[in-house]
């Protein structure tokens, strides 16, 4: 984990390595820092918020916006996250939206661009991880980059380029049935190669244990052969620390949020940022509380069942929905009297069989758009009805709800656990949000998080 003896040792080794070769880059003194050292482009809001929360927990001030145009208006944070809903949209649209974010961050002078995507590398052959990375290579001027989706603490690991969920290849896991991005090929070298003209190679696990010098030599040899993209084997937390030490000076890096936890120690060791931690806090937020769930992940279904033991839950059947407006009106009529007695849950989440039936009727994208449209419009109506605390399950759902609510900038709290980000809007009548990855979080997360929002110490 970030701050561990292993990561500190690697950071020190990294510093000694460069000083001994007179490669240290002159840095600005702390008091005159005006350029961010780390610019993150996240392909969904849950992951973007998680990344920001990890940096904040490490004492790194981090701005968080959903509109690239707002990057210029931020103060002088050393890190900025631009989170957009691009994970499952067509590649050309994802590239266009990412270009706006990248240009905004580079215009601020970002020292490194980090493209954040999911630990399960959610992407089909028509996916956009490859095209977006191609764009970022061009804009950043990077000659090569690596791909590190792994999250060892959650048993999302990569070995010989193959992605595992626990002991299962991802193609043998429930992710093979994902309604939007079914993962049927576990070989990430193959998956990525089908999305890009850049040659894809592998940083095999034995190299990670050999040290930085052998890693750099291997990369130099492979790039001489034309390789530009490297899938990084990652099994242990120490592998993430090694990869962070290797890539902290790269113009472009890509991966899951977990590797980001290891950068702050390196930045501090190099004098890029002050060693003193900031002490962020989020205010308590009152008002009614609601769970809005759109994810069909097994973990979200378990969390809904747990929440329902003590709180009412409405499940919206997409096959019976007579359009967005009708479904929203019916859900609002159901929720209003119940909110007087405590939090409620409203979900479009369904079993895989039910999802398949909805997709047969509406198409894959049509079913997703219907569900997101219902929950997004419902969030607006619920806010008008006095709801100020929202727990949202699902990355695509989170993006839709934040967009419908017109939220463009958030004050993010420190990291609260894998896949979980908590934030408040910066306004006189704030809204508290927990944007949760569909696949992650403890079973009792919904009720405990809504309760914690009532107390500032609960979301600090």
How would you label these PLM feature ranges?
Residues 3-5, 10, 24-28:
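Short, low-complexity intrinsically disordered segments enriched in A/P/G/S/L with frequent Arg
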Residues 36-75, 96-97:
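N-terminal basic/disordered segments at the start of proteins
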Residues 50-53, 125-129, 156-164, 214-215, ...:
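Short acidic, glycine/serine/threonine-rich loops at helix termini
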Residues 68-69, 90-104:
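Glycine-rich, highly charged phosphate/nucleotide-binding loops
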Residues 167-331:
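Conserved, well-structured core segments that form the ligand-binding/active-site neighborhood
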Residues 335, 339-393:
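C-terminal structural cap/anchor segments
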Residues 387-388, 396-445:
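Conserved, well-ordered active-site substructure
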